[in-house]
């Protein structure tokens, strides 16, 4: 199976909203919620993709020859590659009933673990979403990151208990999720969090806590103040606020603000290839999350589809490193890329 096969297979079963496009750039699905689309006019997801494309890589092969080492150390673990599958919940709502949250997470979490990376898992108004996600992580010996929505504190405590029982190595919260149209005025309630509220949640985790949905230096410093081990520079793929800047536009300043603090910086939004992963690392990220294409990979090929996509990313990353003179992840530097 190759990636073209994965896309072709996915188009047969992924549902009416996602088109399993050859290039997942947000154009065909904009303003499709339910579905994978972005909010409002839908141009934030498109901008995310386009801004990575605007960054070019600087080739330099006047260096020692060698096989690039793509390993990275994060959250007390060693990963084969510096990228992770992003969180998705309620797949039968946003895609199709070919998969339930249980079967989707079982495939994704296990396939990612077997390939040397980890999957972040989703949450939703239906409590079964988190239950199924944490069961899948438990079945994979804790190799996954449950991602909790910013509910009221009582609901967070319940879901945090499930997360910890899974043996996960870290817990995340997508703090921007209160902007999701399908969470507005729902029960349980979700909303923004103060630094004090976030600090209380961080303590509940009792393991590295990742704040997902940071788009400003100010927000990054608040997450640091609350005790976060890492942040994810993210606008939720354009799904929570229309007319946002792209993550590639704000990543460098946020990474610079957190440099030397010990807080790790991850980024998502429109990253589709191993070359994009390289660009993100060059701009200061410690790691990358990729979401929508992993959904396509599961629907298009199950565990084999996930492995196919991971291998594709890994090959592209290693090739770019080799052609730019970086023999390890730590050797990827800002001067290896240039903005248009």
Predicted stretch roles:
Residues 2-80, 332:
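An N-cap/entry alpha-helix motif that binds or orients negatively charged groups
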Residues 1-27, 219, 238-261, 271-340:
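Conserved active-site-proximal phosphate/metal-binding subdomains
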């Amino acid at each position: 199976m190759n990636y073209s096969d994965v896309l072709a297979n996915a188009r047969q079963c992924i549902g009416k909203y996602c088109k399993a496009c050859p290039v997942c750039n947000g154009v065909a699905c904009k303003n499709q919620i339910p579905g994978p689309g972005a909010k409002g006019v839908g141009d934030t997801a498109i901008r995310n993709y386009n801004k990575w494309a605007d960054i070019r890589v600087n080739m330099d092969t006047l260096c020692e020859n060698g096989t690039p080492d793509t390993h990275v150390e994060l959250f007390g673990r060693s990963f084969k590659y510096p990228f992770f599958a992003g969180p998705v919940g309620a797949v039968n709502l946003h895609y199709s009933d070919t998969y339930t949250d249980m079967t989707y997470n079982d495939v994704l979490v296990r396939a990612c673990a077997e390939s040397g990376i980890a999957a972040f898992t989703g949450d939703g108004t239906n409590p079964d979403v988190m239950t199924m996600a944490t069961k899948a992580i438990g079945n994979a010996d804790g190799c996954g990151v449950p991602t909790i929505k910013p509910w009221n504190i009582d609901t967070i405590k319940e879901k945090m208990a499930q997360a910890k029982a899974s043996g996960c190595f870290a817990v995340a919260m997508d703090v921007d999720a209160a902007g999701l149209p399908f969470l507005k005025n729902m029960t349980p309630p979700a909303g923004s969090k103060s630094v004090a509220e976030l600090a209380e949640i961080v303590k509940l985790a009792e393991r590295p806590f990742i704040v997902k949905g940071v788009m400003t230096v100010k927000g990054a410093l608040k997450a640091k103040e609350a005790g976060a081990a890492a942040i994810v520079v993210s606008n939720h793929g354009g799904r929570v606020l229309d007319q946002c800047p792209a993550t590639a536009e704000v990543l460098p300043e946020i990474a610079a603000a957190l440099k030397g603090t010990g807080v790790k910086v991850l980024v998502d939004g429109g990253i589709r290839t191993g070359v994009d992963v390289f660009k993100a690392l060059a701009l200061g990220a410690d790691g990358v999350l990729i979401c929508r294409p992993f959904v396509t990979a599961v629907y298009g090929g199950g565990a084999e589809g996930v492995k196919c996509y991971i291998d594709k990313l890994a090959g592209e990353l290693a090739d770019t490193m080799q052609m730019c003179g970086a023999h390890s992840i730590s050797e990827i530097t800002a001067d290896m890329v240039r903005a248009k």
